[in-house]
A protein has these predicted regions:
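Structural signature for solvent-exposed beta-strand/loop edge elements and short helix-capping sites
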Residues: 1-383
Length: 383
């Protein structure tokens, strides 16, 4: 209906230029201008277009509506807003929406936004009934409440189960107070439990990550909140400043201020390079590390403790090497140097002159220097 409707009988066309309304059983559409093509069962609307449905409303500059299929086609800036409690809204400039099935397909630029998450991609499919979105090509899933953005070639987001995953050149960016963590893996998975107040993201296969004060590689990795614990699994290696950290299992508490604590379990090993042929080393069953201002400052060794560290004079020249064995140890670190060591329970320590033993005889069991695997930049995580 309209205050003034012009109808062309031979062409079976009608139009209005001063606000009109189109209604069916569930939908009410209004616009300033409208053109109805009866033979094509198509209506074109422009200027202040509003489509209202019990479940949603569409606000657009212009759209075409196919009356036989109840499909809205968008060719300009469009916003689809859910009227339910989930507050989901969609933005697009090119795509279509099946109003009967509540399914849509959008082409770039596009975005689906829920309470704390947004999804976008070159192509985006969204089912308003199941609350499932699928994206293809330059996919981005952002969790605004956790400062996490996941990107890749293919993505999936389920609002009901609060899960999402991305594959293909997958990258996770987690913003901290001072810098950002960049992580790559074959597949990235995120899940949120709103009732328990817990969220997690997991990386599977070929994990590599870079942060200004922390880098690492492993097969799989998980991070949970609110405990802020990162767990590395299967051949994990971690680097902090000049220290290389390995163990069968590595667990770290990393908050917005950076790394705080470190737990190494089974075959625990920390080493740093003294010079081109010499290495400071610590090994044991279990290690508990503590960070100060983002740097590993102290390590408590529990079980089968061993250490090798080099001593220097006031000018930095090597004077000797300390080889110690003790069940438990407390070691203080200053960068790549051991600044203090306390041996607990039956200590056995020897300080050798620097030239008495060749460096090859001072490599502890389990030593391996893996610097070639270390990610050196954001781009290097894709190596």
């Amino acid at each position: 209906s309209s205050s003034k409707l012009t109808y062309d009988m031979p062409a079976d066309k009608a139009f209005y230029l001063d606000k009109g309304v189109l209604k069916d059983n569930e939908n009410t559409l209004t616009s300033i201008r409208g053109f109805y093509l009866a033979k094509e069962s198509k209506v074109f609307f422009s200027d202040s277009v509003l489509l209202v449905n019990p479940k949603y409303k569409v606000i657009a500059d212009s759209l075409s509506y196919l009356t036989k299929t109840s499909t809205a086609v968008f060719t300009g800036p469009t916003r689809i807003v859910s009227t339910g409690s989930d507050s989901t809204w969609i933005y697009c400039e090119n795509g279509y929406y099946d109003t009967k099935q509540s399914k849509s397909k959008f082409f770039k630029p596009n975005r689906v936004v829920s309470r704390t998450r947004s999804l976008s991609g070159d192509t985006l499919d969204f089912d308003n009934n199941t609350r499932v979105g699928k994206a293809f090509g330059r996919v981005m899933i952002a969790d605004t409440s956790r400062s996490v953005v996941i990107s890749g070639d293919k993505g999936f987001s389920d609002d009901k189960s609060r899960t999402a995953f991305v594959t293909g050149n997958a990258e996770l960016m987690r913003t901290f107070t001072k810098d950002t963590l960049f992580l790559h893996a074959d597949t990235l998975y995120a899940k949120e439990d709103t009732l328990a107040g817990v969220s997690s993201w997991t990386a599977y296969r070929g994990v590599r990550f870079f942060k200004s004060d922390l880098q690492g590689v492993c097969d799989s990795l998980s991070y949970t909140t609110p405990d802020s614990i990162m767990r590395m699994h299967v051949a994990p290696v971690l680097w902090n400043d000049s220290n290389q950290v390995t163990a069968e299992h590595i667990q770290m508490r990393i908050t917005n201020n950076g790394p705080e604590t470190l737990l190494l379990e089974s075959a625990s090993f920390i080493c740093s390079q003294q010079d081109s042929i010499r290495f400071n080393q610590i090994s044991g069953k279990r290690m508990d590390g503590f960070f100060v201002d983002g740097e590993l400052a102290s390590v408590k060794v529990s079980g089968n403790g061993q250490s090798v560290y080099y001593t220097e004079d006031s000018k930095g020249a090597l004077t000797g090497v300390n080889n110690a064995e003790c069940s438990d140890m407390l070691i203080l670190l200053d960068g790549r140097k051991v600044s203090g060591i306390t041996l607990i329970n039956e200590p056995d320590a020897t300080l050798y002159p620097i030239k008495e033993l060749p460096p090859s005889e001072l490599l502890l069991k389990g030593f391996k220097w893996l610097q070639s695997q270390r990610p050196l930049s954001r781009q290097d995580i894709f190596r």
